[in-house]
């Protein structure tokens, strides 16, 4: 278990030294490209899309125009920003549509993209347009995850990430701090990253 050090500035200095040693002093600007404001699940306690589900009568109208998505990718390329991932709520686009969007973005930017579009069992449909798959773990505590994201099974997320690795994709997870986790949960998070061979958090 990690104990809180009384001198936080020493910890920050040590973290900075470690970061510079491991990653250098260059940073990149990244932007997530959102595909839609609709999510079929719509019950994650922290998510804006959860506040919109009952207000959206026709989910197709909450989808972004794909040409606007492509224009955003072109702007990212011209600004030399990385695209963090494509993000969209559950059932906002089909797998075939996501594949087409990702392929076009790869053609625009010259780089494959990460996906953060929910749990899927259709990963084999994707190819070189996809760099990696992101699992929305969100909370570093399984019991709290069940309360915060009741419709997103942590077991299904974990299985999807393992399958993604078997198919040759890189793997990432999203974790949001401040949803009720404690320092005791850090050990669980570190073990999760190791057990599922996560490339990026």
Task: List PLM regions with ranges.
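An N-cap/entry alpha-helix motif that binds or orients negatively charged groups
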Residues: 1-30
């Amino acid at each position: 278990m990690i104990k809180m050090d009384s001198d936080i500035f020493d910890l920050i200095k040590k973290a900075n030294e470690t970061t510079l040693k491991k990653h250098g002093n260059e940073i990149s600007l990244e932007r997530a490209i959102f595909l839609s404001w609709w999510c079929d699940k719509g019950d994650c306690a922290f998510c804006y899309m959860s506040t919109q589900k009952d207000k959206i009568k026709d989910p197709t109208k909450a989808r972004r125009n794909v040409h606007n998505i492509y224009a955003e990718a072109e702007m990212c390329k011209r600004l030399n920003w990385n695209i963090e991932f494509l993000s969209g709520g559950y059932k906002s686009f089909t797998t075939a549509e996501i594949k087409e969007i990702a392929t076009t973005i790869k053609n625009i930017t010259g780089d494959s993209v990460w996906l953060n579009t929910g749990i899927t069992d259709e990963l084999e449909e994707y190819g070189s347009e996809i760099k990696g798959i992101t699992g929305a773990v969100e909370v570093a505590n399984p019991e709290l995850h069940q309360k915060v994201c009741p419709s997103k099974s942590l077991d299904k997320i974990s299985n999807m990430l393992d399958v993604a690795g078997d198919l040759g994709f890189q793997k990432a997870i999203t974790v949001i701090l401040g949803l009720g986790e404690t320092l005791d949960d850090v050990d669980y998070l570190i073990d999760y990253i190791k057990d599922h061979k996560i490339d990026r958090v």
